Amino acid sequence: FKQKTAYEIVDCDWSSDVCSSDLKYYNYDIRTIHDYTVFGKFDVIFHLVAIARIQPSFQNPEDYFTTNANATLKLAKCCSDNNIPLIYAGSSSHHSGKFKNPYTFSKDVGEEVVKLFEMHYGLKATIARFYNVYGPHHLKEGGYCTLIGTWEKRIENNESLIIYGDGTKRRDFTHVQDIVDALILILQKNAWGHIFELGRGKNYSIRDIANMFGKLISYKEDKPGEAEITLCTDTAARDVLGWEPKLNIEDYINNYLNGKDNIRTTE
C-alpha cells in the first residue's frame, strides 16, 4: 500500500512481525481501544483486523466475537463521531451462511454493525469481502494460518500435505497484492456505500492445489463448518472500480517452488 500511495500510514496491531520499519506502528489489541483519534488525524481507516480461520473459532468463540464484532462496533462509532471513512474487510464465508461457524457469524455481525452506522449515524463506509487471500508474509504456523501457508511450512519441513475430506472442496484464491489494489481503488474513487466481492472469479479444488505443489498428500477426516465452494461471481468491483485481479495461484506456487515467491506475475 505504501508503495502505491502518498499517504502516511499508521499501523495498529498486536503483532509487528510483518510491519514495515518505515510505518508508524502502535502495538495494541483493538478490543482495548475506544478512541482511535489519539493516534492521529486520519483521512480513512482500513479495518483489516480480525481473528481469522474457521476451525479455531469453534474452540474460542468469545475471542472471535469480542474482536470481530464488538471491536468493530467501537471503531465504527469512532469513525462516525469523527467523520472518518471506514473500509471494512468482510469475508467470502458470508455466502456459506452466517451460522456455519462462529468465525463467519462474527464477521457477519461486523458487517451489520457497519451497515447500521451507515444508516443511522452518518458513517461513510464500504465493505470489501476477501476471498481466500494468499501471498508473501502470510502466516505459516499456528491455528490461524492459511491453507497455502500451512502447506508451505509442511514442504519446508519435508512433510506431506494434509487434506481434510476428499479434496473436492473448491476455493477462489486471491493474491494479497490484488486485494491491496482494490482497496486503493475504493479510496481513490470515493466508492462509499458499496459491498465489493474481491475474488478472482475462478476456483480450484483443494486436491488440484495440492497437486500443483507436487508433493505427497495425506488425507484426514473432514472438519465441520467449512463451505463446499467459494467462487466470486459478483462483478461490482470490476464495474464500479475498474478492478481486475492480475495474479494467479498457479504462478505463485511455481514461483514459491523455485524460490521466487515474492515476484509479481500476471496471466
Which role fits each region the language model picked out?
Residues 30-66:
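NAD(P)H-binding glycine-rich loop region in Rossmannoid oxidoreductase-like domains
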Residues 86, 90-91, 113-137, 162, ...:
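Conserved beta-loop-beta element that borders a ligand/cofactor-binding pocket
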Residues 166, 195-196, 204-210, 214-234:
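C-terminal "lid/loop" region of Rossmann-like NAD(P)-dependent oxidoreductases
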